[in-house]
Amino acid sequence: MKLLEERILKDGHILDDNILKVDSFLTHQVDFSLMREIGKVFAEKFAATGITKVVTIEASGIAPAVFTAEALNVPMIFAKKAKNITMNEGILTAQVYSFTKQVTSTVSIAGKFLSPEDKVLIIDDFLANGQAAKGLIQIIEQAGATVQAIGIVIEKSFQDGRDLLEKAGYPVLSLARLDRFENGQVVFKEADL
């Protein structure tokens, strides 16, 4: 997605040779017009697959996921990273390791929001090692629902997340694919769209 790649080049910052900071439009402050365009692109790509729910993980996946759900006219569910006293029955959980934060969290979704009839589109802000998506897949499958595809805003193609997910049989669509960081600049790999 050319618009996203241009924004990454303009406002993204490389940290430690393997982390891209995009807090000015995605991971802290949100550019809603860009997120709306991202949502439309994902919705157009997956409209024919019968998606009934969009699922993400808090926090930075929420903006692109909610705009995708809006464009598809389906509910969006986000997995919570912290235990909540109001979520006390029928909770579906998985362990997720965060590459950026270097911690493992138990993420959860109330089971009442997913059913075996659901066809789910996972949306996330980044794909690095695939652990967030893997955890969401585990939760979705605990409910008996089906993962139709995984939509990623920014993929770090130099890490093994995509390979892990595709080998497990899940289609992955990334709007921006980072090939590498070179001389303080992002070098893109051809995106899926």
Curated annotation (Swiss-Prot):
CDD domains: PRTases_typeI. It is found in: Cytoplasm. Disulfide bonds: none annotated. Coiled coil: none annotated. Xanthine binds at L20, T27, K156. It holds the Pfam family Pribosyltran. It catalyses: XMP + diphosphate = xanthine + 5-phospho-alpha-D-ribose 1-diphosphate. Keywords: Cytoplasm, Glycosyltransferase, Purine salvage, Transferase. GO terms for molecular function: xanthine phosphoribosyltransferase activity. Pathway: Purine metabolism; XMP biosynthesis via salvage pathway; XMP from xanthine: step 1/1. GO terms for biological process: purine ribonucleoside salvage; xanthine metabolic process; XMP salvage. It is an enzyme of class 2 (transferase). Its EC number is 2.4.2.22. 5-phospho-alpha-D-ribose 1-diphosphate binds at A128, N129, G130, Q131, A132. One of its GO terms (cellular component) is cytoplasm. Gene3D superfamilies: 3.40.50.2020. Homodimer. Belongs to the purine/pyrimidine phosphoribosyltransferase family. Xpt subfamily. Converts the preformed base xanthine, a product of nucleic acid breakdown, to xanthosine 5'-monophosphate (XMP), so it can be reused for RNA or DNA synthesis. This is Xanthine phosphoribosyltransferase. It comes from Streptococcus pneumoniae serotype 2 (strain D39 / NCTC 7466). The lineage of its organism: Bacteria, Bacillati, Bacillota, Bacilli, Lactobacillales. The gene is xpt.
